[in-house]
Amino acid sequence: MGPVRILVVDDFEAWRRSIVSIIADDPELQVIHEASDGVEAVQMCQELQPDLVVLDVGLPKLSGLEAARQIRIVSPDSKILFLSVIPSQYVMREALRIGAAGYITKEDALRDLLPAVRAAVADREFLSFTILPEPQSDLPEE
């Protein structure tokens, strides 16, 4: 089996470069393409059928969550790993409901990206430790 073929999707070029740089450290992983918005991500998944998509939540044209829903249709064997600046349990739960293999925060990317990629490839879920708890609605108002 060859290297794991990865599509990296983030609207900020600096983040894409960082993600690609981290992935390049592992000879068993290969970035096959980069995309900067949700529409391009879906198109590239349909065309390239990557093994794994590292997908930002906050994307232009089509949100990461909506792109993931469409990727599940056009490239059903592609695993999806969300990478987000948003440490939200709600967004994380929605990502997992869609079928994501994991959800990591950009804050933790240096530490968590490669372990999360390896977990996704092995069909294991991976979540960042810094996902914030949801606000409690039953707290007394001041």
Regions found by a protein language model. Give the residues of each.
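Conserved acidic segment of CheY-like receiver
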Residues: 2-15, 19-23
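Active-site residues of response regulator receiver
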Residues: 10, 56, 84
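The feature encodes the CheY-like receiver
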Residues: 15, 60, 84, 88
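Short hydrophobic/Thr-rich beta-strand motif most characteristic of the beta2 strand and flanking loop
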Residues: 28-36, 44
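Acidic catalytic/metal-coordinating carboxylates
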Residues: 37-40, 63-66
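Conserved phosphotransfer cores of two-component systems
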Residues: 46-48, 70-78, 98
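Active-site beta3 strand of CheY-like receiver
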Residues: 48-54, 59
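Short, flexible helix-to-coil linker/hinge segments that flank and couple to helix-turn-helix
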Residues: 90-97, 102-142
